[in-house]
Amino acid sequence: MSKLVKLFITSISAITLALVSFTSSFAKVEGDYIVLGSAISLTGKYSSNGVHTQNGYNLAVERINKMGGVNVGGKSYKFEIIYYDDESNPKRAAQLAERLIKQDGVHYMLGPYSSGLTKAIAPVTEKYKIPMVEANGASRSLFTKGYKYLFAVLSPANQYLEVAIDLAVEKNGGKPVRIAQAFEQDAFSQDVRLGILDAAKRTGSKIIIDDKLPKELNDMAATLA
């Protein structure tokens, strides 16, 4: 099983644990099904990863349902998911989260793809006290706002490459290393960058290149020269 699929199954499993913690009256139930909601990127710039995300959610739900679903309040339920295409647009994602909660009546959400879209939806789920488990939003700022209804199954972006710096220092006999980095200026990429800066300071390593890349980049020759 691929790492990506395992991540999505972990996401659904986290929702399952949350469900077991509540009574069945809290969730939207249609017959023997508990209905989850997800605004996901099926079109637009995130569509490729959005479709992968949807496929992962569907695979996890299929496996859980085949195993008999989950037990809530002494009764077994299976999952189904209502999807809407957020078009890779934060404003649209927030609107669809409102629709899923207010019109479709879902009481549990699965997160979108990307930190930006997760940031757009999180205030909505927080407003309505709807738990959202997400596996694709890693920006550090998501976890510094005191959200009580946002649950992530991955580490924050600032931790992504810290271990790489630690490993490089270890392989260098414990001595500081020279680091070259180049990142786009979006929130996620800059969070990864800040993690490297922290690791460099901690290990006494030196940043020799710290380039900020434009949004549309076709040539990195200047950085690599």
Regions found by a protein language model. Give the residues of each.
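Extracellular/periplasmic Venus flytrap/periplasmic-binding protein
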Residues: 140-141, 148-225
